Amino acid sequence: SARTKGLIPVHLYGQAANMDPLMELAQKHHLRVIEDTAQAFGSDYHGKKLGTIGHVGCFSFYPTKILGAYGDGGLIITDDDQIAEVARTLRAHGAKRNYYNEMVGYNSRLDAIQAAILSVKLPYIDQWIAGRREAARNYNRLLKDMPGVIIPYEAPYTKHVYNQYTIRVLNGKRDQLWRQLHEAGIGTMIYYPIPVHKLPVYERTAPSLEVSERYAGEALSLPIWPQMEMETQRLVVEKISEIVNG
């Protein structure tokens, strides 16, 4: 609409959104593109690193992310000097120099301890991504023929880094599977139980989005980490089969 100022593609679970059509749309309507790369550090789109395609790339260093700090942290990258200046000002209470606030800002500075931890972990990131991708391939082999389960799809234009390995559980059995896996000591997560348009803050924007609502009732993220052993994955999949097809 005439009120639209920008687009925010989300590289969900570790896989790139299809950026070319979005960038073409943005160029046509003079919009800014802000990439949400929180779950996809190290992934790419047609060989170009995510976060470097749009006007701004946003990264999360929360401990559960591909590259995680010990606490909260994040990064914004851009090649636009004006955006960079505003971002630097916003992160420091809206001030370019001490005690001289020019806009309403935040305390969003990355502290030295988090930066040090990230600096130590960064050299291992390619190795850890390779480990996640191998674990995902193992899950794919173990789950691909299981009735009632749809495994993740890796788009041909990207390298999925599997911040989450998220399956779809059909026939209304997702919540039962989540509950019984939890009872068996297998940690899984539901990302995300409520679609954005159903949250109170946005519920007036769209009365119904059927695909989003269906997927929200089917998505289940299985345990995955770079050093995950095949035997552990077999145990997870055996329990899933027992519950879904029992």
Where do the PLM segments sit?
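Short glycine-enriched loop/turn motifs at secondary-structure junctions
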Residues: 67-71, 158-161
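Active-site phosphate-binding strand-loop segment of PLP-dependent enzymes
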Residues: 1-69, 75-77, 225
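Acidic, glycine-centered active-site loop in nucleotide-sugar glycosyltransferases
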Residues: 53-54, 72, 165, 181
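PLP-dependent aminotransferase class I/II
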Residues: 6-10, 15, 19-21, 28, ...
